[in-house]
From Swiss-Prot:
Coiled coil: none annotated. Binds ribosomal protein uS19. Belongs to the RimM family. Keywords: Chaperone, Cytoplasm, Ribosome biogenesis, rRNA processing. The keyword Hydrolase does not apply. Residues 95-169 form the PRC barrel domain. It comes from the Bacteria. This is Ribosome maturation factor RimM. It is found in: Cytoplasm. Pfam families: PRC_RimM, RimM. One of its GO terms (cellular component) is cytoplasm. It comes from Lactobacillus johnsonii (strain CNCM I-12250 / La1 / NCC 533). One of its GO terms (biological process) is rRNA processing.
Amino acid sequence: MTEYFEVGKILSPHGLKGEVKVNATTDFPEERLATGSRLFIKNNKQYEELIVENTRRHKQFYLVKFEKIDDIDQAEKICSKELYVAETDQQELPEGSYYFKDILNCPVYDAETGEKLGVLENIETPGANDIWEIKPEKGKSFWIPNIESVVKKVDLANKRIEVTLLEGLRDEN
């Protein structure tokens, strides 16, 4: 059974010829929304294929024209729907890169002491660097930046993340 992963959301029609405004939630919007790309929307628990005919950047959004969506009425029918990519259409990532789904819920350890700090519970992408929320077994969650001086090793095969905490990143109280 194919798995699907969210890569954006269709917000509203744009113009009269079937174009829609898309908020991309992927790290690879140019790749995911490229001409000829295969995306999916969910209709009544079924995934329906959409093929990208054309894409252009517009402010912080993308204006996307899908094949067979040729007027505003058809465009309105797909608005407010999430866009998905099939797992089989995901590309291999370069060394040192990973999909969020592969690292979420991984145990996080102190690289120096080996102490388990918690699990990676959430990832936010506010700007230049992602930030990761670490949930310890007891106590409050804390956030760390995904930068080289903090995240030392991500071992996908063994589901293990090693970090060096900078002073002040973790509230011990």
